Amino acid sequence: PNHIGLHTYEKSISSFQGTQKLELDLLRICAEEIFKAVPNNYDGYVASGGTECNMQAVWIYREYYKNVLDAKNDEIIVLFSEDTHYSLFKVCNILQLNFKLLNVDFNSREIDFEKLDNLLSELKADGVKYFITVLNMGTTMFGSIDDIDSITHLYKSHNIQFKIHVDAAFGGFIYPFTNPNNVFNFENPNVDSISVDGHKMLQAPYGTGIFLIRKGLIDNVLTEEASYIEGLDHTLCGSRSGANAIATWMILNMHGSKGLMDHMEQLIIKSDFICKSLSELDVQFFRNEYMNIVTILSEDIPRRICEKYTLVPDTHKGQPKWWKIVVMEHVNWQLIDNFLNDVTQYKNETIHNLRPNQAIL
């Protein structure tokens, strides 16, 4: 089925109303049950993935600033951390928007707020008036979570216009279930839009991205010229398959909220065990306690072990600084034990090889 258009509006193409209702219910589950939106106070659609969702969000906010505040492109800037998904570089290039990378601490992966404070002052002095910020609910490499409260407090202290899109491509189907104090949702008035990938934690077919935004903002990108389409089209992609929406709806209903929570908690238990064991071996790593990503400092683990267990490097160009473990359902206890045994053996060999030098000293 072709799910072209935006089905959160009353009028849409009548040919596939049955499957469109499933997409609407999928949006309801995600917006209302997971991200705490007020019923019927949001728009959204099932996109091709996180890249399209990020593009859709920044496009909407660019047009919002132009339509509502008469902004010019060079008065708008996009801010995101250096750990943010690479799609933002594409987005800014295509939309012809300037951007600034926000520095993060090497160990904590937290945005450096002192530098951000200085940057905001510099940008305002240079004539930048309108800010679009992409914050992360689970970065690709680290699973790190940006501090939305501190960032928005800083923005308000500078008295600037800002819109915030939450890139929850990875974390959106785990973090809200594992962290009862999650503030990345529509109860937070500073959150304007959220996107989450179904093909990551839910293992829905590629590519499945779910884009959600507060009601009415998406009107800024209505394509008036699509007059031959029954209904309204506000989407970047236009025609799109309804199959992914149907599959994701079925997966969520198969699990149920309790089943999905139990599933994610099992991944956290395994991640906790890996981290506890690595700490006992004096292996340095980064992990957010509510996420299933464990990222190990490269100097504490040899490449041969990383490649044996298909850990993901932060770069394929030169020497990686970090190696990533993503704890999914296939990561069973036997695999975890084998990995930790290999790391233990490596650490023991390293200590043994150091002993002769230590004796000389």
Task: Outline where the language-model segments fall.
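Short glycine/serine- and small hydrophobic-enriched flexible loop segments
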Residues: 32, 59-63, 249-254
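Phosphate-/polyanion-interacting regions in eukaryotic proteins
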Residues: 1-3
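Secondary-structure capping and boundary motifs in well-ordered enzyme cores
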Residues: 18, 46-53, 80, 84, ...
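Active-site C-terminal subdomain of aminotransferase-like
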Residues: 177-180, 184-288
